[in-house]
Structures are given as C-alpha cells and as structure tokens.
UniProtKB/Swiss-Prot annotation:
Subcellular location: Cytoplasm
GO cellular component: cytoplasm
Record bears the keyword Cytoplasm: yes
This protein's name: Regulatory protein RecX
Biological role stated in the UniProt entry: Modulates RecA activity.
Name of the gene: recX
Family of this protein: Belongs to the RecX family.
Domain of life: Bacteria
Keywords, in A-Z order: Cytoplasm
Short name of one Pfam family: RecX_HTH3
The keyword Cytoplasm is assigned to this record: yes
InterPro entries (alphabetical): RecX_HTH_2nd, RecX_HTH_3rd, WH-like_DNA-bd_sf
Main location per the UniProt record: cytoplasm
C-alpha cells in the first residue's frame, strides 16, 4: 500500500526504497514500474512540455527529479542529456 501511494505521488525508486526502509519493510519484491515514464510524467506535470531553456533551468529540473528519488541516469534521459545541448549564448 505504501508503495502504490508513493508511486502515485510521483516518487522515484530511491525515495521509495528509503521510505520502505523507514517503515521497516524489506523492498525485496521487484516493482514492475517504468521509472523513465514515471519521471517523464512527473517532470511534465511540474514544468510542462517545454525542454530546459538554459543550464540553470536544466539544473533546477534535475534537482527536482533527484529530490523525488529518481536516479541520475533516469534524470539525464528525461532531460535529454543524450542529445547535444548547447546552452551558451554565442
């Protein structure tokens, strides 16, 4: 029950694991959750469909997702770090 509640609230796997440990529950069951899709939905709800406009905006979104408990790899994939981003104003 705690698991479903936290996922509905938009928390990621790291936060979920921490909450389960605090409650004294072992997180041995593998959750069938697409964390990338979950992170994209949380980011879209908070920031809309627009991609980060500059390095400051990128960092703000990354901090938000990290605070929600998503992994660094998931955050980079959601924010498009795989694509070449040039935030410098030439």
């Amino acid at each position: 029950m705690l698991t479903r509640t936290r996922v509905r609230q938009g928390h990621g796997p790291l936060r979920l694991r921490q909450d389960l440990q605090r409650a004294g529950v072992e997180a041995t069951a593998a959750l069938e959750i697409d964390w990338l899709q979950q992170a994209q939905a949380v980011c879209q709800k908070r920031f809309g469909d627009t991609p980060p406009t500059d390095a400051r905006d990128y960092a703000r979104r990354a901090r938000f997702l990290a605070g929600r408990g998503f992994t660094g790899e998931t955050i980079r994939r959601v924010l498009g770090a795989g694509r070449e981003r040039d935030f410098s104003a030439d």
